[in-house]
Amino acid sequence: MGKLSTIGRIFFGIAIAVLGALTIYYDDFPYMLIPPKHSWIPGFAIVAYIFGAMLILAGACIVFEKMIKQASIILGTMLFLIFCFYFIPYQFIKSSEYIHFGAWENAAKELSLAGGAFVIASRYFVNKESLLNRFLSKIISTGAILFSITIISFGIDHFLFAKEAADYVPSWVPYHLFWMYFTGTALIGSGLAVIFKIKVRQIASLLGIMIFIWFAILHIPRVVFSPSADLGSEIASACLALAYSGIAFVIAGGATKKIV
């Protein structure tokens, strides 16, 4: 892997591991990993510990390149199954706001992490002539598309909820609404570019840089100055930004590599 992909892989692995640590520390899942109403799950604390440990292990495997293909495939599959068989039913059955685009934001975050795990796996996957490997190659080849679709949806959110989200921009940055619309445009354009393979290396690199800048100037200060009641959510949001930046860098670094 090139330097850009290596940086992205490490970013993503760290983010996943920290999400796992948060799950164990708070005896609960970060807000985007499963829907909020999960009290029906028997032995929930034990489930949270096991899931958190799996995230830490997967993150460590990704960072240190140990069984990284297997860890990434398992991680991506697990997150994708949660999206399909928990988030989607929850949105239609339990949530009364499923017709509103913004109500799907957390589900999209789950899907983006699943796509990111498949992107990582695709960089280490070597196709062998077996039914299982052909099946796996089809699944992991969707990673960049899944990630790009969610990035586009986040861009649309920046337009739909620009005024509500403008306060997230640091106070010392002028023209808050401009930056909301600029970021939304950049996210939508980047997602479309990756899907349609238009200057993927350059645009994915710029996407990763943009998200990392927001990670540094927006999310880190919010973590540092957050009240204790909100600290877990702010750390989780920072992890998402770091993960997205990492995924974009891995896509950029592997833009010339044919997935087999």
For every predicted segment, state its role:
Residues 26-40, 132, 159-176:
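Membrane-interface interhelical connector segments
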Residues 1-28, 44-57, 63-160, 178-185, ...:
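Extended, low-polarity transmembrane helix blocks
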